[in-house]
Amino acid sequence: MNLRFELQKLLNVCFLFASAYMFWQGLAIATNSASPIVVVLSGSMEPAFQRGDILFLWNRNTFNQVGDVVVYEVEGKQIPIVHRVLRQHNNHADKQFLLTKGDNNAGNDISLYANKKIYLNKSKEIVGTVKGYFPQLGYITIWISENKYAKFALLGMLGLSALLGGE
């Protein structure tokens, strides 16, 4: 076993993870969104978006219009919600407030908002506006998050390939 060769493999794995992290951060800066890519986790936006679709977000537009699909985060909940803008209000200070609703839901989202709010503050709660999507590719992440053994198996396979892989 050559120590120099093993250290080089470890360095390559570290470089791979650092490159992925830098790519994600660059994408976040370019889109002005902390989560520039999200996966649809429920059927609340059917038929427009199905469970497992990957959505690409953009957060550099000044105002959202009625009909735009936005992703927002509610205080106290970690899962972003993908819904359509039902109403929008602007005040004199260039702030925008949005009321949203899932296409497949009967009513609006007021019951989902934190602290009994009736509108979302775009600058504080909107993660981004959907600008594109890739159908069903997100099922991989859903499967990994819902299957506790899949996480360990995936990490194990990555570790084994890094250790056993040669040039």
From Swiss-Prot:
CDD domains, per the entry: Peptidase_S24_S26 (cd06462)
Paired cysteines (S-S): none
Molecular function per GO: peptidase activity; serine-type endopeptidase activity
Top-level enzyme category: hydrolase
Family: Belongs to the peptidase S26B family.
Recorded domain comment: The C-terminal short (CTS) helix is essential for catalytic activity. It may be accommodated as a transmembrane helix in the thinned membrane environment of the complex, similarly to the signal peptide in the complex substrates.
Note: Present with 3150 molecules/cell in log phase SD medium.
The protein's name: Signal peptidase complex catalytic subunit SEC11
Organism of this sequence: Saccharomyces cerevisiae (strain ATCC 204508 / S288c) (Baker's yeast)
